[in-house]
Structures are given as structure tokens and as C-alpha cells.
């Protein structure tokens, strides 16, 4: 699955959770791959399909997208996991992190 296919997959899954979802343009996305809306709140999402752990760059990108999209919340979603540095930076910036286990739980996926 390519990175863009992963973004499309997340679009479908978030819609099943009741979000309105906008998939941003592949280039010039200003740090967000998806823009979610639910209950009057806007959340920007950086999606990373990686075989290794996601580092701080993904968190930095999504934090940078908050102002551009006038978002209330931010999150990084990956099929993998996160480095300790990424977790620390996300915590400091109130960015929600969903790794493989969170995706399976939130989207009700059985291994």
C-alpha cells in the first residue's frame, strides 16, 4: 500500500467513525493529509505509512498545519509506532498519536 492509498484508507475509516473528511492535495498539503470535522471541531491529520517508527518531523509538520487550516486539534496516524522524541514533542503540543494498536482499536480491526 502506498502512502496515498493509506491516506484514502484512513479517509474511509474516519468516515465510518462519523467524521466529514477532506483529503488534501498530494503536494502543497501544508503539513496535513486529512482534515476532519466532527461536532464543530476541525482536526488536521498527518498520515505516515512507515515500516520504521515515525519521528519528530511528522509531529512538526502537523503542528505547522494547525494555523494554516485553523484547526482545533492535530493528530499523526501511522501503521507503525513512534519514537520517544516524537511522543515527547506530541505531548508538549497536544498532538494525538495513533499507532498500529490505536488504529486497530479505534477502527475495530482484528489481527
Q: PLM features: what roles do these ranges have?
A:
Residues 1-111:
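Mixed-charge (Asp/Glu-Lys/Arg
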Amino acid at each position: 500500500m502506498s502512502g496515498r492509498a493509506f491516506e484514502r484508507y484512513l479517509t474511509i475509516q474516519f468516515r465510518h467513525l462519523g467524521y466529514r473528511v477532506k483529503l488534501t492535495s498530494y503536494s502543497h498539503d501544508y503539513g496535513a493529509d486529512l482534515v476532519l470535522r466532527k461536532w464543530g471541531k476541525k482536526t488536521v491529520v498527518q498520515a505516515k505509512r512507515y515500516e520504521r517508527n515515525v519521528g519528530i518531523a511528522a509531529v512538526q509538520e502537523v503542528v505547522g498545519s494547525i494555523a494554516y487550516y485553523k484547526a482545533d486539534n492535530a493528530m499523526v496516524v501511522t501503521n507503525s509506532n513512534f519514537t520517544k522524541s516524537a511522543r515527547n514533542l506530541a505531548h508538549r503540543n497536544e498532538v494525538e498519536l495513533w499507532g498500529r494498536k490505536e488504529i486497530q482499536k479505534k477502527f475495530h480491526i482484528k489481527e
